[in-house]
A protein has these predicted regions:
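Single conserved hydrophobic/aromatic residue that forms the stacking wall/gate
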Residues: 1-9, 13
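Long, contiguous juxta-domain segments that are non-catalytic but functionally important
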Residues: 17-47
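A glycine-rich, hydrophobic loop/mini-helix early in the fold
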Residues: 42-82
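Histidine-centered divalent-metal-coordination microenvironment in nucleic-acid enzymes
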Residues: 54, 107-128
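Short, charged, solvent-exposed linker or helix-capping segments at domain edges/interfaces
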Residues: 65-67, 131-138
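A short, contiguous, amphipathic alpha-helix enriched in charged residues
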Residues: 79-103
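Compact beta-sheet-dominated globular domain cores
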Residues: 125, 137-140
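Intrinsically disordered, low-complexity terminal/linker regions enriched in Pro/Ser/Gly
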Residues: 139-186
Length: 186
């Protein structure tokens, strides 16, 4: 995963001042270079034209579910203690993807968290940029079927959430997709 809990805690303490600054910035903050170059390069970042990095924040904790005022079986009317089946990192990727409809999400990585928010940096590529089109390692992202990657769980965090990093015994109902197996896989 992104980094050990211990390292994460150390980073949070070290970056407390930095996060205080981030909290006052917009939810989607475009930045010039990655905050964690090691993490960025691990998930595919290279400093080239046509590459955009956006830092975003998402609320922490379980699902915020609205109260429904219509009739329900009491057991189905739950609001608290419900965990979303989608990770906060995936939510971050999806929101950034909606914010930049002309770009495509390559990947993302964790950069910090405080009491209320988790901060992620999302790497986006411009599929119409000549440098990306000519790049042998990245030209695949210009193809039509790579549209809406984040929304369809095709990023690294998305694949993890769909269980596709598991294989062998116990993973029989994960492929080709959860939906194909009537969501019995997760």
């Amino acid at each position: 995963h992104h980094c050990s809990v211990r390292r994460q805690r150390q980073m949070c303490i070290r970056d407390r001042g930095r996060m205080a600054e981030w909290r006052h910035q917009p939810v989607f903050q475009r930045i010039d270079k990655p905050t964690r170059i090691d993490a960025a390069r691990r998930v595919g970042y290279r400093a080239k034209q046509g590459v955009v990095i956006c830092r975003t924040r998402v609320r922490r904790g379980g699902l915020r579910k609205g109260v429904v005022n219509m009739k329900r079986k009491p057991s189905k009317a739950g609001v608290t203690k419900i965990t979303m089946a989608k990770s906060i990192q995936r939510i971050a990727e999806e929101r950034v993807s909606r914010r930049y409809p002309n770009l495509r999400v390559l990947n993302s990585y964790w950069v910090g968290e405080d009491g209320k928010n988790k901060f992620f940096e999302v790497i986006l590529l411009d599929p119409n940029h000549p440098v990306i089109i000519a790049d042998s390692q990245w030209s695949w992202i210009t193809e039509n079927h790579q549209k809406g990657r984040a929304m369809r769980g095709m990023t690294s965090a998305g694949k993890r959430g769909r269980g596709l990093y598991n294989k062998g015994k116990g993973a029989e109902k994960l492929r080709p997709s959860l939906n194909a197996n009537k969501n019995r896989g997760k």
